[in-house]
Amino acid sequence: MTAILITGYRSFEIGIFDHKDPRVSIIKQAIRKDLIGYLENGVDWFIFTGNLGFEQWALEVANELKEEYPLQIATIFLFETHGDKWNEKNQEVLSQFRAVDFVKYYFPNYEQPTQFSQYYQFLLEKTEGAYVFYDTENETNLKYFLKKAKDMPYYQLLLLTFDRLNDMSQS
C-alpha cells in the first residue's frame, strides 16, 4: 500500500471565493495530471485533512479518477468538530470529505496547541509522501508541516507552485 497526503492552500488564502473562478479549472488540470502520475506509479490511497480549497478540488478530481483507477480515499480530520460552524454550502463539501472510503477523527476536540504537531507527525508517519499546493512566496502555516516533511528521510514531496500553474496555463 502506498499512501499520499494531499494538502495545500485553502481557497481564501489564494483569493478564490467562487468555485467558478477560472483559476480553479487550471488548478484542477494540474491536480489531474499529478494524481494520474501518482496512480501510474503505484499509489493506491489519497489522504485528505478535509480543508476547503486545494483539498476540495483534489477530492473532486480523485473521485472522478475512481472511475478509471483502483484507488482509495481517506479523510483524517484533526478534530471531530471540524467544519461544524461552516455555512450550508461548505457543509456540502464537508459531507463529500465524509463520504470517502475511510474517515478518522484524530482528536475529539481541541484541548492544547501540541495537538497540531502530533496530528502532522501522525500524517507523516502514515504516508509515504505528500502532494502540496504551496509556494514559499506565499507562506502559511503549512510551512511547519513542510519543514517536518523535509526532515524525514525518504519522504517524497511534490509541490504544486504558482510557477508550475503559470506554465500549465500558458500551454
From Swiss-Prot:
HAMAP family: UPF0398 (MF_01575). InterPro entries: YspA. NCBIfam families: PRK13660.1. It comes from the Bacteria. This is UPF0398 protein SpyM3_1388. Coiled coil: none annotated. Pfam families: YpsA. It comes from Streptococcus pyogenes serotype M3 (strain ATCC BAA-595 / MGAS315).
